[in-house]
Amino acid sequence: MEIISQYGSWLVWITAVFGFFMAFGIGANDVSNSMGTSVGSGTITAKQAIIIALIFESAGAYLAGGEVTQTIKSGVIEPIQFVDTPDILALGMLSTLFASGAWLFIATKMGWPVSGTHTIIGAIIGFACITIGPSSVDWSKIGSIVGSWFVTPVIAGILAYAIFASTQKLIFDTEQPLKNAQKYGPYYMGITVFVLCIVTMKKGLKHVGLNLSNSETLIISLAISLIGMFFFHFYFKSKIFTQSANKGTFGAVEKVFSILMLLTACAMAFAHGSNDVANAIGPLSAVVSIVNEGGKIVSGGALTWWILPLGALGIAVGLITMGQKVMATVGSGITDLTPSRGFAAQFATAMTVVVASGTGLPISTTQTLVGAILGIGFARGIAALNLTVIRNIISSWIVTLPAGAFFAIIIFYVLRTIFN
């Protein structure tokens, strides 16, 4: 309590800086890898990807604002355990932010796509273990997270393999690929819109009071997907499409999948912004709340007005200044991508997110996407995969939790020494 009463304003300022650093890391790594397939496949340029990501990530982040004050969303520890030592929780959140930002910065410099959520969970584990003991951590939750490293990439890889194989059989390996793309394209579009609507309503819009039942979500998604399917049925048959496409070439076919891929990338960026923004501003909100309440730990309350813009700014700066490093790894480092291959990977990721949301399986979008890209590579043969890059990526996943914990412990001791 003494630290909060004496240094409350300093804690808020320092946490704001650390929160910006964490948001910077999310923008440079998490957001960048989600747009990597679109850039690597040639669907859009890196500059266009940055603009699209900023628009949809920011939109998702602002819609998430009302729920972010639930701070430690991971469920790894319960804040109530710090009710008698709020100053320890405040320093712990400071440590968590800096540690997570530091690991994301290092991973980005190395070109490793890692999970921001897993990074911050590792950091929370680190400071919790040295302050209130290992028993305070919900280790079953950690077991589920570790299990997801294997389960979700495999699911996404299998789905991506199946989607890619279907496009080859129905479209690319036929005598008239463009005609078949016009024939089957609307069906791919309808299925894509159906899944993306579910992702948006269940993941992206759950923070704005849109409490739809599963049946309502399915009905609305089906209706929108049917509208989309009919629209693109006429679009692919129209002169606008046929004149812009170069008939008889695979480039014209790939244009169909470019549209699908762009839709998927926008929807996933929106869902990511509405959920993962809490990784940066959740701990920041916790410290501000503790200071404003004079040391009391509250579970709800209004979000201070400047926190969301700070998080959005940090994500934007990180994406613009360092985003292309991870984009390159995801977009071209693992395997060569075309719009059809990139769509298969992005769509498989979206489908896996839907499955995980329905089953409660903890999921990293980063790891899911990488698993989907691996599935595409396997469909083309093992020689199509860059095994060195894959080895480095998997190693970085394994290191992420302990790295977050290690940095958090170091920073916590430094901060405690300074403020004591």
Curated annotation (Swiss-Prot):
The free-text function statement in the UniProt record for this protein reads: Potential transporter for phosphate.
| One Gene Ontology molecular-function label | phosphate transmembrane transporter activity
Q: What is its main location?
A: membrane
Family, per entry: Belongs to the inorganic phosphate transporter (PiT) (TC 2.A.20) family.
Q: What is this protein called?
A: Putative phosphate permease HI_1604
An example GO BP is:
phosphate ion transmembrane transport
One GO CC term, this protein: plasma membrane
TM helices/strands, residue ranges: 8-28, 49-69, 88-108, 112-132, 145-165, 185-205, 216-236, 250-270, 300-320, 343-363, 370-390, 393-413
Q: How does it sit in the membrane?
A: Multi-pass membrane protein
Q: Which domain of life is it from?
A: Bacteria
User: Which cellular compartments is it found in?
Assistant: Cell inner membrane
**Pfam families assigned to the protein according to its UniProt record, in alphabetical order:** PHO4
